Amino acid sequence: MWGDKMRYFPIGVFDSGVGGLTVLKRLMEVLPQENYVYFGDTRRVPYGDRSKEEIKAFTKQIMNFLKKKNVKIFVIACNTISAVFEKEGKEIVFNVVEAGVKSAVETTCNKRIGVIGTRRTTEERIYSNKIKEINKSIEVYEVACPELVPLIEKGFYKTESVKRVVIECVKNLKEEKIDTLVLGCTHYPIVIDYIEEALIGENVRIVDPAERLAYDVKEYITRVNMINPNGSGQVQFYLSKMTQSFIEIAKILLEGKINNYNVSIVDITKY
């Protein structure tokens, strides 16, 4: 389908910051032989309170940058970007929302699904709309948790402040008797322990869209014969600003895949 050499090109993964590392982790578990290029917009995070126009402009810059890195597919590892993304070219693009929607519909038994995400994601009602396209009888309750991403990006992901925010975020969803909760932001798996604790005794199954996404990507590149036959799982990281929390979280999630030699700073506004 594509030129044979493209199978050796890396997979491009991008997010507003550290959240996309949870997606990269899943991809590397499912496709360990692939090489990856990761971009985190750590200078302009969070995206959740930005306008659609800003997010679209930032996304275009990031994708232009990743094209220069010869990525064979793009993985949008950010729900906020996914919620406003409009495909323009012929690029192969996967996003977490599509995967999360499919997983949520397959998971729910009582047809009551909760979604926690950024303000932009929940205001777009992207999960509600796409879930109802599949099954109109499913009720979807979306709650914005705007405080979480800034706290996680600052490195406060194991604090009482985060715990309190999580409890407040899921409180109303528990009252709606949901049986499925979608993590509608890729930062949230980083605080999964607090989320699970807040849901103890509620018999709620948690959906991390990245799990389905990784297998969707694998299925696609296998089908079009684009699996890298001799890759080594290398990752090149690019950030718009160096932050200690990014390095710390990457070391925890990716277990040795990040060091001083594979992290570069890029002025993304030039793209």
Curated annotation (Swiss-Prot):
What is the superkingdom listed in this entry's lineage?
Bacteria
Q: In which pathway does it act?
A: Cell wall biogenesis; peptidoglycan biosynthesis
User: Its Gene Ontology molecular function terms?
Assistant: glutamate racemase activity
Q: Where is the active site?
A: 78, 185
Q: Which UniProt keywords apply?
A: Cell shape, Cell wall biogenesis/degradation, Isomerase, Peptidoglycan synthesis
Q: Which InterPro entries match?
A: Asp/Glu/hydantoin_racemase, Asp/Glu_race, Asp/Glu_racemase_AS_2, Glu_race
Q: Which SUPFAM superfamilies match?
A: Aspartate/glutamate racemase
Q: Which GO terms describe its biological process?
A: cell wall organization; peptidoglycan biosynthetic process; regulation of cell shape
Locate the residues binding substrate: 15-16, 47-48, 79-80, 186-187
Family designation: Belongs to the aspartate/glutamate racemases family.
Its annotated function is as follows: Provides the (R)-glutamate required for cell wall biosynthesis.
Q: Which HAMAP family match?
A: Glu_racemase
Put simply, this protein is called Glutamate racemase 3
Identify the species of origin.
Caldanaerobacter subterraneus subsp. tengcongensis (strain DSM 15242 / JCM 11007 / NBRC 100824 / MB4)
